[in-house]
């Protein structure tokens, strides 16, 4: 959770001038402490909520039956109290963000997704993608903590207008919002994308004017790559429980694909992940032009593809020891590659 937020700082934690140098509304250590606190409390609340909601199922699966709540060492009331206390702690840390009200609006989609996640396997075979969304949302909150808008939905979800806060994008701001961010040079990979429902559905007559959704391309691609990274890892982890999931009627990517085709699905996710990281680098503003340096491409897309590719190739989905080893240790290879690639961009851009 914290790593996803830290990655956002390297992926565009502010924008200051035509050279692509970055400036932050707060000292970098202050922002990192905020992200550490928010990640700590959110992770506690999310894990406890997942265990609480899953307790009736966990007691039916040998691998999870000895967890604290199913075995009765922690009462459901105590677990719920722990969830609420840590959720309150996460909410309090939002007060330290440059725009607390805006930070809450950006956090709300992930709050709802995290509450739903334990029930996703009851309704769909794609709970790994739901989990990926929840964990990758740290990219959004890392951007917001740095004073950046990773996306804006009209005036409904955006940061409070403030000329002192840098923006990841400002090409399509609605009238009445004035920011001093210069427009980057044209590129084949635009730094922003604007989606308008009336434009996307030209043959549909809407009785209202829906707000336009403006997306920062670097953050959209980094968010997608982070979500797929988590989905790949959790799919390997979920392979341990495929027999119990089939017996209980629960869904997962291994259940959907079967163990024989799960690796093919993982290779497909990895290809999309690598493509997103390449697009992220191509759309980053910098050096008077647009695009990341060669160090980014070598470490982020290259390193992640190599590390995840080795994991998908080597893991034995039928061996719990193999899946657990890769789930536990392979994380550091991918995380290190991402931190190194995006960190190389951040170091060269901070004012």
Positions of PLM-derived features:
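Multi-pass alpha-helical membrane architecture of UbiA-family
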Residues: 1-351
């Amino acid at each position: 959770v914290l790593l996803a937020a830290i990655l956002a700082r390297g992926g565009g934690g502010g924008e200051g001038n035509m050279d692509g140098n970055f400036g932050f509304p707060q000292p970098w250590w202050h922002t990192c402490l905020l992200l550490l606190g928010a990640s700590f409390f959110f992770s506690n609340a999310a894990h406890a909520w997942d265990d609480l909601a899953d307790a009736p199922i966990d007691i039916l699966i040998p691998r999870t039956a000895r967890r604290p709540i199913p075995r009765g060492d922690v009462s459901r009331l105590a677990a719920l109290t722990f969830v609420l206390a840590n959720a309150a702690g996460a909410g309090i840390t939002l007060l330290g963000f440059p725009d607390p009200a805006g930070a809450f609006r950006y956090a709300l989609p992930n709050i709802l997704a995290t509450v739903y996640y334990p029930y996703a396997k009851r309704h769909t075979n794609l709970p790994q993608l739901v989990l990926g969304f929840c964990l990758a949302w740290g990219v959004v909150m890392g951007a917001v903590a740095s004073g950046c808008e990773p996306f804006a939905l009209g005036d409904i979800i955006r940061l409070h207008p403030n000329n002192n806060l840098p923006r990841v994008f400002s090409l399509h701001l609605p009238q009445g919002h004035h920011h001093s961010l210069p427009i980057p040079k044209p590129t084949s990979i635009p730094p922003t994308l604007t989606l308008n429902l009336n434009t996307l559905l030209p043959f549909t007559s809407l009785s209202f004017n829906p707000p336009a959704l403006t997306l920062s391309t670097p953050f959209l691609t980094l968010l997608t790559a982070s979500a797929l990274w988590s989905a790949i890892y959790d799919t390997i982890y979920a392979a341990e429980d495929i027999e119990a999931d089939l017996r209980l009627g629960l869904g997962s990517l291994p259940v959907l694909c079967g163990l024989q085709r799960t690796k093919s699905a993982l290779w497909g996710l990895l290809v999309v992940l690598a493509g997103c990281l390449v697009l992220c680098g191509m759309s980053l503003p910098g050096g008077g032009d647009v695009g990341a340096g060669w160090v980014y491409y070598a470490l982020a897309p290259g390193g992640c593809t190599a590390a995840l590719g080795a994991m998908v190739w080597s893991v034995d989905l039928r061996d719990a020891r193999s899946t657990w080893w890769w789930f536990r240790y392979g994380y550091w290879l991918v995380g290190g590659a991402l931190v190194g690639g995006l960190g190389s961009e951040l170091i060269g851009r901070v004012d």
